[in-house]
Amino acid sequence: MKITIEELPELRIAYFRNVGEYGGKQNKELMESFKKWAQLNGVFHNSVILGIPQDDPSITPKEECRYDVGVVLNEDFNVLQPAQVGKLPGGKYAVFLLDHTKEAVSEFWGNIFSEIEKNSLTMRGEPIIERYTSQMIDNHLCEVLVPIQ
């Protein structure tokens, strides 16, 4: 698996949140609702969409797992409801490019910790981020950003 390292600044985001089991139809519906909001508010075109699982499902009960879908915004953008405003911490990330299929994503999550260890990296205690651009979506790809030290 190919890894690139990227340094990100702290990012301001607008996001929608779902609470419940990861990977279900609710997260897909959340993404579709968020895209509609982003289009109506003029922040969808040429944007970077983020999927952010906030909790570790091996620790947090599945019905309490939080999943955010968001878009990066500049500081002066006025975020309208029902979106919320948040910050993503800056720092160093290991970036993995994946086929955006259920099988590839499932395989990634099954191998992530061994890949991090194999590459002598140490994870930070921040959420892992899924990143999508329109070009990636058109090519059935996504990136997963793993926070590292």
Swiss-Prot record:
Signal peptide: none
Pfam families registered for this protein in UniProt: GyrI-like (PF06445)
Protein name: SPbeta prophage-derived putative transcriptional regulator YosT
Species per Swiss-Prot/TrEMBL record: Bacillus subtilis (strain 168)
Annotated gene: yosT
